[in-house]
Amino acid sequence: IRKEAGIVGMGGATFPTHVKLAPPPDKKVDTVILNGAECEPYLTSDHRLMLEYPENVVFGLQALMKALGVKKGYIGIETNKPDAIEKVFEAAKDVADIEVVALKTKYPQGAEKQLIYACTGREVPSGGLPADAGVVVNNVGTAAAVAKAIKTGMPLIERIVTVTGAGVN
């Protein structure tokens, strides 16, 4: 469904999700990590998503784990978002093999290699990809898009956008 629904990475790169879910046979992936760090100033779309649709984030992670045949999932969220940590933890509390990780608030905590290390203690080899450490990383928005596609059959045609700063009252 991820391919037919046009699901792409919602963290910014728009990499096709179905490609991430088909690692080379020599890469033994056993973990999926969702990136909820959103460490760039003024960006709050992922934060709002985790507050308003935490169940979709968790459901999407379960679907990604099932697609890859893995048993372990993490959702990494920086500690400057305690409300999001609480909401996502509540949504995931009864789901086996999913752990919400409170990440130290620092830049660039949301970068793939830092996120993988913070959640699993594994290091991605220099010049390597997350699959070299047995991990696939997706954004929380990507997981929510997967959930929406599964639940409604709707392709990816929209995303959450936030507006912030001095010009907003």
What do these predicted ranges mean?
Residues I1-I116:
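Iron-sulfur-cluster electron-transfer modules
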Residues K71-N169:
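Hydrophobic alpha-helical positions that pack around
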